[in-house]
From Swiss-Prot:
Induction: Expression is not detected at both the levels of transcription and translation under standard laboratory conditions. The record marks 161, 231 as: Critical for catalysis. The gene is 13AIDH-D. This is Isocitrate dehydrogenase [NADP] 1. Transmembrane segments: none annotated. Optimum temperature is 55 degrees Celsius. Maintains 90% of its maximum activity after incubation for 10 min at 50 degrees Celsius. GO terms for molecular function: isocitrate dehydrogenase (NADP+) activity; magnesium ion binding; NAD binding.
Amino acid sequence: MPYDKVIVPRDGAKITVNADLSLNVPNHPIIPFIEGDGIGVDITPVMIKVVDAAVAKAYQGKKSIVWMEVYCGEKASKIYDGEYMPTETLEILREYVISIKGPLTTPVGGGMRSLNVALRQELDLYVCQRPVRWFEGVPSPVHSPELTDMVIFRENSEDIYAGIEWKAGSDDAKKVIKFLKEEMGVTKIRFSDDCGIGIKPVSKEGSQRLVRKAIQHAIDNDLPSVTLVHKGNIMKFTEGAFKEWGYELAAERFGAELLDGGPWMTMKNPKTGNDIIIKDVIADAFLQQILMRPAEYSVVATLNLNGDYISDALAAEVGGIGIAPGANKGGSIAVYEATHGTAPKYAGQDKVNPGSLILSAEMMLRDMGWIEAADLVIAGIKGAIKNKTVTYDFERLMPDAILLSSSEFGKAIIKHMDA
């Protein structure tokens, strides 16, 4: 179908989705991309060049990606008369199934709190999937970063990120406080006359669809455990319910059984016959254990706020969010993204590390079934880092490293695909 501002390439075809949510990927799929704000202008072109090189090398012209630019954020506001998230963009992201985006800024002033959060909610991208791994040679503040190798499944649609809150002193806040006191008998609001109020929605459906994705990932990748991370010791009916619903889903959907009387459970991987342990950990204890015993964890399922903290804490252990990939996924739609911010003071300087977006594109290639191209991206990144040809964030911490710009780092990755 024709669009108002977006030009659909003549070559290429759409990715389609089967009834079982598997993908039909043509040899020349059209992939929408959002350049992103700030440093998006630097890192997105590098990502495209690296991906194109990997695909060309892997398939010798038999496959290629046909890129289609769509708009969100500051660039969209200029093209769509002030709209930061045009309806047209949302329609395209739904229709073309798989897309990738750079970092987005949040409009200053009232209204939309975060474009990233709004995008997830509008498209019901209820999973934020964040793989965390260390590449040899990357500077790390921990003693054995190679022990950290896990995938975070963060619930994207609920928890306090739903944005249901009222400003202290507002009429709406006063109404909610009055209702809580007079209708619900709440007596624990310490300073109720000048208090902001927020709601933390956590549902059975939202919790279980996330845990189902996490367990399926463990099955598909033959991983030994899924850990439910929560604060159920304090918030029993939200975080605690998440834990209970997770265990319930494991039993009912995957046949998990109690381990040594519970609450931990065990199940057989139906593809390999290996054991998968379903366990839970309190969030604050987990933040200690990822420093002290990271090798004990492989797949993590958690609610929105905990997932935000945990993802970035883990990224710091393996080199920072500059090389931390991520994807937001729903039933059939996936938007891969740079996990860092827009860093506007560096925009246009060809300076920052494009690794986060490149590794997110590697996730995209792997999910498309283009494993050979994905492997080449990994080989290129490994080679560039091992050779100490890196961007400034790594160069300043690596003795005898060679400082590269964003675009030069992309060229180094492509060069090391041949290694």
